[in-house]
Amino acid sequence: MIDPFKRLARKGLFLFDPETAHGMSIAALKSGLVPACQITPDPRLCQTVAGLTFENPLGMAAGYDKNAEVPEALLKLGFGFTEIGTVTPKPQAGNPRPRIFRLVEDEAVINRLGFNNEGHEAAFGRLAALSGRGIVGVNIGANKDSEDRIADYVAGIRRFHSVARYFTANISSPNTPGLRDLQARESLAALLSSVLAARDEVAAASGRKVPVFLKIAPDLTEEGMDDIAAEALAHALDGLIVSNTTLSRDGLKDQRQAKETGGLSGVPLFEKSTAVLARMRKRVGAALPIIGVGGVSSAETALEKIRAGADLVQLYSCMVYEGPGLPGDIVRGLSKLMDREKAAGIGELRDSRLDYWAARKV
């Protein structure tokens, strides 16, 4: 339940259109107006995934800090890691405004931003100036007008390999025409071959091998999931992120806003994304890391992602409704859930409801 102060702050922020409010929140983090979260590190929440050690399993998903303006400020809110981007080689404006819509009754957001960002060079300059403390991933994408989208992903690997703690290849945004076609098996094989070859080449030269994750859509057929799992394993991908936004509008209360085109995120995405997560875990086996995203709004929903097969979880849209105190609340809540479950480590609980979620309707 949102407290009265948060309710008042949200009401004030919601007087502005969503994109203006987003810019205001970035400015507040930059200026230090948002207080840091005081969390006592809990070793039970610590996870080593893809060779990286995460103080806790909660991350900020890509899409909020597109241009790497506030990664350190986000980490101070209690996140165990954060992900900047999606960044493309060249700056691009994205789709025309309005392009973000709040569905307040549903605690959801629809966006059709279209990879608006300042490009590789701007983000690289900011990341290079960071202290180096904390895990900051880089989510890479392709320009809308690119003649060779795979080359754009390779360019991202080459540009950011010295500053990224991990990469995410985002091929699942519904807002760049044709981008999701890269999830088709033949295209995906070509993408992974090129991206991982570039990563290995720069690793050989630098001595620094950066893990690569693939972010996939929730709107996949069973055959599509089979294909992605097979290619991920065949190419020794470092991990998956499940999932991006959905095109589905099932069960929404706000039918007026539901008519807007774009990807839906927030609370209504939880069931679908968690079911796809479990299905992918079944397909890839126990060893491949998976980050679960979609509808995480509490410690309970974060833990449920882990029970469904995730090693780590991310959120974004639910913070729009709950405010910057949400990550701290979730991390503290996870510690309490560890007490309740009498678990020595959160990894013990992974897959404990895998069968349940894998059987759920997608």
Curated annotation (Swiss-Prot):
Its cofactor is FMN. The active site is at S173. FMN binds at A62, G63, Y64, D65, K66, T86, N139, N170, K215, S243, G266, G295, Y316, S317. It is a peripheral membrane protein. Its EC number is 1.3.5.2. GO terms for biological process: 'de novo' pyrimidine nucleobase biosynthetic process; 'de novo' UMP biosynthetic process. Keywords: Cell membrane, Flavoprotein, FMN, Membrane, Oxidoreductase, Pyrimidine biosynthesis. Substrate binds at K66, N111, R112, L113, G114, F115, N170, N175, N244, T245. Its main location: membrane. Transmembrane segments: none annotated. GO terms for molecular function: dihydroorotate dehydrogenase (quinone) activity. It is found in: Cell membrane. It holds the Pfam family DHO_dh. Pathway: Pyrimidine metabolism; UMP biosynthesis via de novo pathway; orotate from (S)-dihydroorotate (quinone route): step 1/1. One of its GO terms (cellular component) is cytoplasm. PROSITE patterns: DHODEHASE_1, DHODEHASE_2. Signal peptide: none annotated. Binds 1 FMN per subunit. It catalyses: (S)-dihydroorotate + a quinone = orotate + a quinol. Catalyzes the conversion of dihydroorotate to orotate with quinone as electron acceptor. Monomer. Belongs to the dihydroorotate dehydrogenase family. Type 2 subfamily. This is Dihydroorotate dehydrogenase (quinone).
